[in-house]
Amino acid sequence: MAAAAAQGGGGGEPRRTEGVGPGVPGEVEMVKGQPFDVGPRYTQLQYIGEGAYGMVSSAYDHVRKTRVAIKKISPFEHQTYCQRTLREIQILLRFRHENVIGIRDILRASTLEAMRDVYIVQDLMETDLYKLLKSQQLSNDHICYFLYQILRGLKYIHSANVLHRDLKPSNLLINTTCDLKICDFGLARIADPEHDHTGFLTEYVATRWYRAPEIMLNSKGYTKSIDIWSVGCILAEMLSNRPIFPGKHYLDQLNHILGILGSPSQEDLNCIINMKARNYLQSLPSKTKVAWAKLFPKSDSKALDLLDRMLTFNPNKRITVEEALAHPYLEQYYDPTDEPVAEEPFTFAMELDDLPKERLKELIFQETARFQPGVLEAP
């Protein structure tokens, strides 16, 4: 769920009810029938949107004297939701970058037993790229600037040895001054090309249209190049206001990709370690690559050259984030001295996939302790 999507949405005036917030007695504002226990610091709530396991509202922060986004998450009934919540909190509390959404505050009950919800406070961003592309055609200048910021943020993420794995327009938040921040790290993973993540053509949780082909074709090999493929899909969508590979299911997704890129070369096929996948591709009719200029006749030729290097079938030949930033299309913004990297690689102390939801709840409680009143953050 995008952490701070477009403001508005019209929840109307929030009702108030007497209650006890996360450690603070007083009134509790209601948003669309949902109590938001975030007072007295955060008031004047307005509904923004909601996802599978939470609602987002804007609120006035009486300490910072500005409006913020508050994501109410109620994940504790489901292991998967607990896992994503913990992973996002762990990552975002350690990340500091202008193009990555940060966490300003976290509110929750003062005891583990009483904790039913978690409230994550973040910067309020007026819209996201998905909504923007629904409403207008972007100029080349806007496309260039947004792409630069996506890659600048991704350079930082990748330098921490983290894969986002779910880059798509709705996870790119934008404000009125065209600042862009990457959000939603619930599916993020440590980069580990040796780990066996998924079998041949099994369904994958991230949004299908932005998936790299190797995710569907290989049982191993999550590398940073999967995020570059997603950015290529996003660039194509900015150029045309429509998804470039809108597959209805994973085989259809592959057919969309090959219908534009053409059939993979023998060298590219040799990189596919899964023989079942390789045999499937070899059984398909031969397809010729479609020229990018034919698909995007009005687009900047440098943009199309970069697009070609991102949407390369073979992940070993795909451009890296550092190379993409240095591409001529982005030369007006490129500044390696102002493209910071993480201070140290990110590591998860443990693999979260196999932990029960009760243990994940304990870890979320511990991870959010620093925001409790009277708690000093450990050095």
Curated annotation (Swiss-Prot):
Task: Describe regulators of its activity.
Answer: Phosphorylated by MAP2K1/MEK1 and MAP2K2/MEK2 on Thr-202 and Tyr-204 in response to external stimuli like insulin or NGF. Both phosphorylations are required for activity. This phosphorylation causes dramatic conformational changes, which enable full activation and interaction of MAPK1/ERK2 with its substrates. Dephosphorylated and inactivated by DUSP3, DUSP6 and DUSP9.
**Post-translational modification (record):** Phosphorylated upon KIT and FLT3 signaling. Dually phosphorylated on Thr-202 and Tyr-204, which activates the enzyme. Ligand-activated ALK induces tyrosine phosphorylation. Dephosphorylated by PTPRJ at Tyr-204. Ubiquitinated by TRIM15 via 'Lys-63'-linked ubiquitination; leading to activation. Deubiquitinated by CYLD.
An example GO biological process term is: xenophagy
Record field: catalytic activity:
L-seryl-[protein] + ATP = O-phospho-L-seryl-[protein] + ADP + H(+); L-threonyl-[protein] + ATP = O-phospho-L-threonyl-[protein] + ADP + H(+)
Point out residues bearing the modification Phosphotyrosine.
Answer: 204
Q: Name one GO molecular function term.
A: phosphotyrosine residue binding
Q: Where is the active site?
A: 166 (proton acceptor)
- Enzyme class name: transferase
Q: Where is this region: Disordered?
A: 1-26
Q: What is known of its domains?
A: The TXY motif contains the threonine and tyrosine residues whose phosphorylation activates the MAP kinases.
For this chain, the family text in UniProt reads: Belongs to the protein kinase superfamily. CMGC Ser/Thr protein kinase family. MAP kinase subfamily.
Name the record gives this protein: Mitogen-activated protein kinase 3
- Give the species: Homo sapiens (Human)
Q: What is the lineage of its organism?
A: Eukaryota, Metazoa, Chordata, Craniata, Vertebrata
Gene name in the database record: MAPK3
